Amino acid sequence: MSNKPSQLTAGKKLRDADKMSHIPIKVVPSNKSTLLKKPSWMKIKLSSDNTRVNEIKAALRKNNLHSVCEEASCPNLNECFNHGTATFMILGDICTRRCPFCDVGHGKPLAVDANEPKKLAETIKDMKLKYVVITSVDRDDLRDGGAQHFADCIREIRLLNPEIKIEILVPDFKGRMDKALACFEQDLPDVFNHNLETAPHLYKQVRPGADYKWSLKLLQKFKEKHPHIPTKSGLMVGLGETNEDIEQVLTDLRAHDVNMLTLGQYLQPSLDHLAVQRFVPPSEFDELGVKAKALGFDQAACGPLVRSSYHADLQASGQEVK
């Protein structure tokens, strides 16, 4: 069966090996015996009290909403849910891209749910959240890449939750940047986040379909239009990059006026995904954090378990996050 979007069945989600077929650089499935052993600093303590976790999951199921925490198999799910924060994933749970580092399913998405913005706003109100992160799958099938739906969500959330802070973690809106950015003119977030993910020489393998310079330009153009709103980006380490590669990406981000940074360890979601090439020790994350601050980032959350939205509320308020 071909994996070209036009020949996919709408609503059918491809995972793991099915998702990885026909990407530019073939991913050879890992052998368990050759996997790098997870170091002690990557071990996570799970809370024995899952009451809050179950409450949030129930609220998501009730309103047919998705969290990237679950869809991307984030290691911090329990901690964040118990903290009372969640990153909501809009526009469905099927992505039109098939990045081999990501655990979100690929396929032909269903039509956009026009009621999702209101359902999302009501869920956030019921959960009494003060800070939310809204992200999405890539929707290359939509004329604006889903930007207007983001804006609709921001507007509806603010109507029911006037004191809330909203961070959006957007896709690259490739081929439709101006159209996408125009959608946010009346409904702005408190933080605009778009992840570069990795060094440019790894893009063909790690982010097929994406373009490093395009992503930098997206961050820069939003900042030019809205200089008072912080821009943010994130990177994974352990995919074959060097620390010098990372430092160059940080330099590029600052050259494009990005204010906030997240830097965390890549973890392999399944044997069919890209393998971890190295586990970066906490001391190196600390050093990279120091260099990031020296380059002029207002906030730099650098640590093995840091993810784009990990304690995003604390980072946005200026607190140190590791």
Swiss-Prot record:
What keywords would UniProt list here?
Answer: 4Fe-4S, Cytoplasm, Iron, Iron-sulfur, Metal-binding, S-adenosyl-L-methionine, Transferase
Family per record: Belongs to the radical SAM superfamily. Lipoyl synthase family.
The cofactor remark states: Binds 2 [4Fe-4S] clusters per subunit. One cluster is coordinated with 3 cysteines and an exchangeable S-adenosyl-L-methionine.
- Annotated [4Fe-4S] cluster 2 binding lies at C95, C99, C102
Binding-site residues for [4Fe-4S] cluster 1, renumbered to this chain: C69, C74, C80, S309
Disulfide-linked positions: none
Q: Which NCBIfam families match?
A: lipA, PRK05481.1, PRK12928.1
Q: Which InterPro entries match?
A: Aldolase_TIM (IPR013785), Elp3/MiaA/NifB-like_rSAM (IPR006638), LIAS_N (IPR031691), Lipoyl_synth (IPR003698), rSAM (IPR007197)
What Enzyme Commission number does this protein have?
2.8.1.8
Q: What is this protein called?
A: Lipoyl synthase
Q: Which GO terms describe its cellular component?
A: cytoplasm
Query: In which broad location class does this protein mainly occur, judging by the first location in its UniProt entry?
Result: cytoplasm
Q: Which residues cross the membrane?
A: none
A GO molecular function assigned to this protein is:
4 iron, 4 sulfur cluster binding
Which cofactors are reported in the record for this sequence? [4Fe-4S] cluster
Provide the Radical SAM core domain boundaries. Answer: 81-298
Pathway membership: Protein modification; protein lipoylation via endogenous pathway; protein N(6)-(lipoyl)lysine from octanoyl-[acyl-carrier-protein]: step 2/2
Catalytic activity of the protein: [[Fe-S] cluster scaffold protein carrying a second [4Fe-4S](2+) cluster] + N(6)-octanoyl-L-lysyl-[protein] + 2 oxidized [2Fe-2S]-[ferredoxin] + 2 S-adenosyl-L-methionine + 4 H(+) = [[Fe-S] cluster scaffold protein] + N(6)-[(R)-dihydrolipoyl]-L-lysyl-[protein] + 4 Fe(3+) + 2 hydrogen sulfide + 2 5'-deoxyadenosine + 2 L-methionine + 2 reduced [2Fe-2S]-[ferredoxin]
